[in-house]
Regions:
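Feature captures the catalytic ectodomains and active-site-proximal regions of enzymes
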Residues: 1-141
C-alpha cells in the first residue's frame, strides 16, 4: 500500500517472496482489473543490504519467470515493468542510488518508447490502456 498510498485500488493482496508474488499475479490475470505487483525483495533484501550476489541470483530467477509470464499474456494485455528508484547493491551506504530506472512495456500495441523524459509517460500509457485521459505525460500506445 505504501507505493500507491492506499488510493484508487479496491484490494491489496499480500505475499512474501518473488515466487509467491508471481503466483498471485498469475491468479489476478484475466480479472479485468489493474494489477500492480511490487517485487520488493530486490530493494529490501538485496539493494539496501548491499548483497550483489543475492541480487544477481534473484534477478536470474525473476528473469526466467518473466519469460514464462510473457507467454501467458493474452491479446490486449499490457505489462509494464518499472521501478521508483535505483538501488545498486554494489554502491556504498544503504540509501537509494541514482540510476535511470527501467521502463519496459509489452503488449496492447506498445511500440518502441525510446528514452522518456518523464515518468508521467508511464501513467499516461496505463491511462490510455484503461481509456482514461491523463493530464500529464504522453502514452506510447
Amino acid at each position: 500500500g505504501d507505493i500507491f498510498a492506499h488510493v484508487g485500488f479496491n484490494e491489496e493482496l499480500q505475499a512474501s517472496g518473488h515466487a509467491r508474488l508471481w503466483e498471485r499475479s498469475r491468479e489476478a490475470m484475466g480479472s479485468g482489473e489493474l494489477v500492480m505487483t511490487n517485487f520488493v525483495d530486490f530493494d529490501m533484501l538485496y539493494g539496501h543490504r548491499r548483497d550483489p550476489k543475492g541480487y544477481g541470483l534473484a534477478l536470474e530467477e525473476w528473469d526466467e519467470e518473466l519469460g514464462r509470464f510473457l507467454k501467458e499474456l493474452k491479446e490486449g494485455d499490457l505489462l509494464v515493468i518499472t521501478a521508483d528508484h535505483g538501488n545498486d547493491p554494489t554502491w556504498r551506504g544503504t540509501d537509494h542510488t541514482r540510476e535511470r530506472v527501467p521502463v519496459l512495456i509489452h503488449g496492447a500495441g506498445a511500440g518502441d518508447g525510446g528514452i522518456r523524459d518523464t515518468f508521467s509517460d508511464v501513467g499516461a500509457t496505463i491511462g490510455d490502456w484503461l481509456g482514461v485521459k491523463m493530464d500529464e505525460g504522453q502514452s506510447i500506445l
